[in-house]
């Protein structure tokens, strides 16, 4: 399994392949198209992320001490952002998720190319992932 550092380097290199942001947005749309999606039962108030302009749901499962995220959105670019975060953080331990600074978002320039409301939504998605991880750590103690 790849480390977070290896995943980050790979992701940054992947984004650098695309020279302009229209291509990068298309890459995000393509990533979002690869998401499995969630069942209607999983799309509920507990999994809905507050602070997003569009509807975003995030679910966290745990297997053998590692967290695996699944999610969905009703907006295509946001769905790609969800996929980006899921690809980055799935398979990490709760401690890794809590400690990670999500610096790759700045390194690829994503935050600066989103509207303020979408940027707030991105922060909310990161906070939800960290909240799941904190909950997991607390349940272990």
What label would you give each PLM region?
Residues 1-55, 62-63, 105-140:
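N-terminal intrinsically disordered, cationic/polar leader segments
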Residues 46-52, 73, 95-97:
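Solvent-exposed interaction patches of small proteins and small membrane subunits
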Residues 65-67:
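Hydrophobic residues embedded in beta-strands of well-ordered beta-sheets
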Residues 74-77, 84-86, 109-113, 133:
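Feature captures hydrophobic
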Residues 82-93:
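Alpha-helical support elements that line or immediately flank enzyme active sites
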Residues 91-108:
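Glycine-rich phosphate/pyrophosphate-binding loops
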